[in-house]
Amino acid sequence: MKIIEASHSIETPIDGAEILKRIEKAGRTCYKSEDRITEESAKSFVRMLIERGHESVLEHESITVRFICDRGISHEIVRHRLASYSQESQRYVRYNGDIEFINPHMPNTKAY
């Protein structure tokens, strides 16, 4: 038996400036303003999209995050369907090696 800690890691390399440029390119299609793209225009354009409530354009970007958490937490994340998910199966457990269990996070009970 192997006890592991809950954790997370961002699997996608992130370049904020490039992300903003790709979102701007997609968003300017909606406003027929592709000709107004400059080296410096992405940040203010994306801010404008958010202020106008045009958040669907932000969905043109994605990142991959790996969460190691207990099944209860993963089911809560998945049921709200905020993204696309791939989840480790409990069906294909390898019993010939160490079985991994996630150490549950318990808040400081003295505070309650």
Identify the function of each model-found stretch.
Residues 1-112:
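Family-specific signature for flavin-dependent thymidylate synthase
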